[in-house]
């Protein structure tokens, strides 16, 4: 395969990349415009529904705001409690395993009849005891973390109960407002996230397009240089032929 053939293959490859990148850019930009339009529509709906509320309901909304703010944190706090509990259980298991290894080493030492057996085992046992100490330290930290997360949850539950006792009627009347607000907010956040993803995809395809254009320019420059070199050699070759 000649150098010209390699260049032709490279050109075809880069042209194909350009076409693919162009198609992808158009596709992702269309999707992006659609999501932007949907976001604007949701935002208008949010403003219309959240701002256009009767004064009487606005009072209930104001009284119950603390309850729903706390309620919005509840699932995250419960998740943290579950994670801390799982980590504590893992650390307890690590401690148990480390202690079992120490016991196994002690049993092996007791069953070994060799005179220098203690010398062989003492370093290993000491190392394993250090591992037990480290595991116990990590377990203690995990236990404290779990206890702290549980306290956070208990405090939250107490605050929620207090809010219900003080503003139960207002909370009941304003619940549809806050539930609708949560739905619209979640929808807008999802749309914003999708917009960010699509913008990233568009930029990646544009970068790919630019890379292919630069590659084609380099191939073009290379071909031009080769032709220029061949042209400069041609007169000298003709002169040599005439002199002979």
From Swiss-Prot:
One of its GO terms (biological process) is cell division. Disulfide bonds: none annotated. Residues 228-238 have a biased composition (Low complexity). One of its GO terms (molecular function) is protein kinase inhibitor activity. Residues 221-244 are annotated as: Disordered. Its main location: cytoplasm. Keywords: Cell cycle, Cell division, Coiled coil, Golgi apparatus, GTP-binding, Membrane, Nucleotide-binding. Residues 6-39, 81-144 form a coiled coil. It comes from the Eukaryota. One of its GO terms (cellular component) is Golgi trans cisterna membrane. Transmembrane segments: none annotated. Expressed in germ cells. It is found in: Cytoplasmic granule; Golgi apparatus membrane. InterPro entries: SH3BP5 (IPR007940). Disruption phenotype: Viable. Disrupted localization of rab-11.1 and prolonged cytokinesis in embryos. Double knockout with rei-2 results in a smaller brood size, weak embryonic lethality, enhanced mislocalization of rab-11.1 and prolonged cytokinesis in embryos. Homodimer, tetramer and multimer. Interacts with rab-11.1. Binds preferentially to the GDP-bound form of rab-11.1. Guanine nucleotide exchange factor for Rab GTPase Rab-11.1. Spatially and temporally regulates the distribution of Rab-11.1 to target membranes during embryogenesis. Plays a role in cytokinesis, probably by targeting rab-11.1 to the cleavage furrows. Belongs to the SH3BP5 family. This is Guanine nucleotide exchange factor rei-1. It comes from Caenorhabditis elegans. The lineage of its organism: Eukaryota, Metazoa, Ecdysozoa, Nematoda, Chromadorea. The gene is rei-1.
């Amino acid at each position: 395969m000649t150098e010209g053939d390699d260049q032709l293959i490279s050109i075809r490859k880069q042209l194909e990349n350009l076409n693919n990148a162009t198609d992808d850019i158009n596709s992702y930009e269309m999707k992006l415009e659609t999501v932007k339009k949907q976001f604007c529509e949701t935002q208008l709906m949010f403003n219309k529904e959240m701002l256009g509320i009767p004064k009487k309901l606005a009072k209930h909304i104001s009284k119950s705001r603390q309850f729903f703010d706390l309620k919005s944190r509840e699932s995250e706090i419960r998740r943290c409690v579950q994670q801390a509990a799982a980590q504590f259980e893992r650390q307890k298991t690590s401690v148990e395993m480390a202690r079992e290894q120490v016991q196994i080493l002690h049993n092996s030492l007791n069953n070994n009849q060799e005179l220098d057996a203690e010398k062989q085992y003492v370093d290993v046992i000491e190392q394993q005891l250090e591992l037990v100490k480290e595991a116990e330290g990590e377990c203690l930290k995990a236990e404290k973390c779990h206890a702290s997360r549980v306290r956070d949850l208990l405090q939250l539950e107490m605050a929620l109960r207090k809010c219900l006792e003080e503003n139960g009627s207002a909370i009941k009347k304003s619940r549809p407002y806050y539930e609708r607000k949560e739905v619209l907010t979640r929808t807008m956040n999802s749309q914003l996230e999708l917009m960010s993803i699509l913008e990233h995809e568009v930029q990646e395809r544009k970068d790919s397009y630019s890379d292919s254009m630069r590659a084609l320019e380099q191939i073009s420059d290379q071909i031009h240089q080769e032709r220029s070199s061949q042209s400069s050699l041609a007169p000298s070759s003709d002169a040599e032929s005439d002199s002979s």
